[in-house]
A protein has these predicted regions:
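Acidic, metal-coordinating helix/loop segments flanking the phosphotransfer/catalytic sites
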Residues: 34-57
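As written
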Residues: 70, 76, 101-109
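C-terminal output helix
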Residues: 114-124
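Charged docking surfaces used in two-component/phosphorelay signaling
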Residues: 19-27, 99
Length: 129
């Protein structure tokens, strides 16, 4: 029996963060896809779910200046999939209230800048394969 490769969707408005996060994920053995904003992430998540190839987790940036950020996107993702595994990232300490983020539906939190170990640890704690 082969082990399933987790499929991770990354949403961040910064191209460099999307690229680096996807590279880190792929080095860890995950399959990844990146989007620049919440609207695109929600649509990509929905399409994958309908196609029968759902994402195992979504990593989303809290603040997207010219688009939908994580707090709005999580509401839409929860409508599509109440069991979505969503991880929020933020570089602003004032935005990171773990209890409030959990109430909103986030499964995990990553403070930017994060190391590959932080990314691996949060995914390992949430994904059961």
């Amino acid at each position: 029996m082969t082990q399933k490769t987790a499929k991770i969707l990354v949403m961040d408005d910064e191209d460099a963060i999307r690229t680096i996060t996807c590279l880190l994920l792929e080095k860890m053995g995950y399959t990844s896809m990146a989007t620049p904003d919440g609207e695109t992430a929600v649509e990509e998540y929905r399409k994958a779910l309908v196609a029968g190839s759902p994402y195992d987790a979504v990593i989303m940036d809290m603040t997207v200046p010219c688009g939908m950020g994580a707090t709005e996107a999580i509401k839409k993702l929860k409508e599509i999939d109440p069991n979505v595994c969503a991880i929020v990232t933020s570089g602003f300490a004032s935005e990171v209230n773990h209890e409030e983020l959990h109430k909103q539906g986030f499964s995990g939190v990553l403070k930017k800048p994060y190391l590959s170990e932080n990314l691996r640890d949060v995914l390992n704690s949430l994904l059961l394969f």
